[in-house]
């Protein structure tokens, strides 16, 4: 018996309502809940349509506003945690699903695959899917890089899409997350990082099911569209950097299929707009803060005041930069947040121009090997990462 949840904010009503109908008609789903950020056009559309969908499918459908549960910017975290609270306190269902509201390729298989994995005993089921080689740059350059550098011996950096909003969890896992103060506090985009980290830290068994058609959803323009998400996802990693992950988590993955051509050939962001953005919004204090970084990074970013530059930010320069950011970055400080954005942008542009342009397969191989090099570097450096006893480590072959 399962509850399906769609958190939403300013989505196209027709897309969300299609997904609600798909979920409500699924034989494994006993209730559908939409969690709105505010009472807007989408909220009212769901509110009007819910009774008809309930009658047609026999599945209760409802919509409610997210509660203010966290202490950071009100956002996705409050929405997902509101759903956890409802699930635990107002229902007796055994499982809860989360799906992003803007998915245009959502179908019953998303639910079926997750349910079947849960039937096999996994506590958390995550969906993963093919992405364009220049998409998911926060995932690759912030979250998975941070996991590899800080916890190289754990499963964290092996999880395909740790920021994915498509997942199923059993009731006991939902309770464990909701009772964790770190999770409830994270009211913003960092919630996905916290869900991933805490479940691995607590040894929850994880299965990743593959969605071959990919996650079709609304796209963004320049990297500037992702600035808030970038800042909040990095801040989430920074807040966890001294945590220890001492027990291995069982982690299995469904084997991926061939990547569709329309995904392999897609460009994930507007390169021209992003290049121009590097030269904007500079302050004297940002230039002063560059003194904390290595000489190539400092001089390279200073150049960006006059013209776009990014050749200096290769993967090793980014690793060194990442450690400086972990130590010195201050969430809520406008200059630090802008500098983080510029540094990350140069890394993404460097990767795009030196790796992604060589083709999809080459780029994917590079990204996985990059994480491997980061894990190895972290394991060798004294004081970096939090290794577990070798006898406890699971094979990742």
Swiss-Prot record:
The keyword Isomerase does not apply. It is an enzyme of class 2 (transferase). (R)-glycerate binds at residues 131, 136-139. Optimum temperature is between 85 and 90 degrees Celsius. It is stable at high temperatures, however at 90 degrees Celsius the stability of the enzyme is only moderate and 50% of the activity is lost after 30 minutes incubation. At 65 degrees Celsius, the specific enzymatic activity is 5-fold lower than the maximum value. It comes from the Bacteria. Its EC number is 2.4.1.269. Its cofactor is Mg(2+); Ca(2+); Mn(2+); Ni(2+). Changing residue 102 to A: Completely inactive. GO terms for biological process: mannosylglycerate biosynthetic process. Divalent cations such as magnesium, calcium and to a lesser extent manganese, nickel and cobalt. Changing residue 229 to A: Minor influence. GO terms for molecular function: hexosyltransferase activity; identical protein binding; mannosylglycerate synthase activity; metal ion binding. The biosynthesis of mannosylglycerate in R.marinus can proceed via an other alternative pathway, in which a mannosyl-3-phosphoglycerate synthase catalyzes the conversion of GDP mannose and D-3-phosphoglycerate into a phosphorylated intermediate, which is subsequently converted to mannosylglycerate by the action of a mannosyl-3-phosphoglycerate phosphatase. Involved in the biosynthesis of the stress protectant 2-O-alpha-D-mannosyl glycerate (MG) which is produced in response to growth at supraoptimal temperature and salinity, and protects several enzymes against inactivation by temperature, freeze-drying and osmotic stress. Catalyzes the condensation of alpha-GDP-D-mannose (GDP-Man) with D-glycerate to produce alpha-mannosyl-D-glycerate. It is specific for GDP-Man, but it can also use alpha-GDP-D-glucose (GDP-Glc), beta-GDP-D-fructose, alpha-UDP-D-mannose and alpha-UDP-D-glucose as sugar donors. This is Mannosylglycerate synthase. The lineage of its organism: Bacteria, Pseudomonadati, Rhodothermota, Rhodothermia, Rhodothermales. The gene is mgs.
């Amino acid at each position: 018996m399962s509850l399906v949840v769609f958190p939403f904010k300013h989505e196209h009503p027709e897309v969300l309502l299609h997904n609600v109908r798909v979920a409500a008609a699924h034989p494994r789903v006993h209730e559908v809940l939409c969690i709105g950020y505010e009472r807007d056009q989408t909220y009212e559309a769901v509110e009007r349509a819910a009774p008809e969908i309930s009658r047609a499918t026999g599945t209760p459908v409802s919509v409610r506003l997210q509660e203010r549960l966290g202490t950071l910017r009100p956002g996705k975290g409050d929405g997902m945690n509101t759903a956890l609270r409802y699930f635990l306190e107002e229902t007796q269902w055994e499982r809860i699903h989360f799906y992003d509201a803007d998915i245009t390729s959502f179908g019953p298989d998303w639910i079926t695959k997750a349910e079947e994995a849960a039937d096999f005993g996994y506590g958390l089921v995550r969906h993963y899917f093919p992405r364009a080689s220049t998409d998911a740059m926060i995932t690759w350059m912030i979250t998975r890089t941070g996991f590899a550098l800080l916890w190289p011996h754990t499963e964290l950096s092996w999880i395909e899409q740790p920021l994915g909003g498509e997942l199923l969890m059993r009731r006991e896992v939902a309770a464990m997350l909701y009772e964790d103060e770190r999770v409830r506090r994270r009211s913003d985009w960092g919630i996905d990082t916290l869900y991933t980290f805490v479940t691995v830290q607590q040894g929850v068994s994880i299965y990743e099911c593959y969605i071959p058609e990919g996650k079709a959803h609304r796209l963004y323009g320049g990297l500037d569209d992702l600035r808030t998400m970038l800042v909040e996802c990095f801040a989430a990693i920074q807040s966890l950097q001294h945590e220890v992950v001492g027990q291995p988590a069982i982690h299995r993955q469904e084997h991926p299929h061939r990547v569709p051509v329309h995904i392999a050939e897609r460009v994930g962001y507007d390169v021209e707009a992003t290049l121009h953005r590097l030269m904007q919004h500079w302050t004297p204090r940002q230039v002063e803060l560059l003194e904390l970084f290595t000489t190539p990074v400092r001089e390279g970013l200073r150049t960006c005041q006059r013209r776009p530059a990014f050749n200096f930010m290769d993967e090793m320069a980014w690793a060194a930069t990442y450690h400086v950011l972990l130590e010195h970055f201050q969430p809520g400080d406008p200059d630090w947040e802008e500098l983080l954005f510029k540094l990350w942008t140069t890394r993404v542009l460097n990767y795009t121009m030196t790796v992604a342009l060589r083709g999809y397969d080459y780029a994917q191989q590079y990204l996985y090997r990059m994480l491997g090099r980061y894990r190895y570097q972290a394991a060798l450096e004294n004081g970096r990462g939090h290794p577990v006893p070798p006898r406890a480590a699971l094979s990742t072959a």
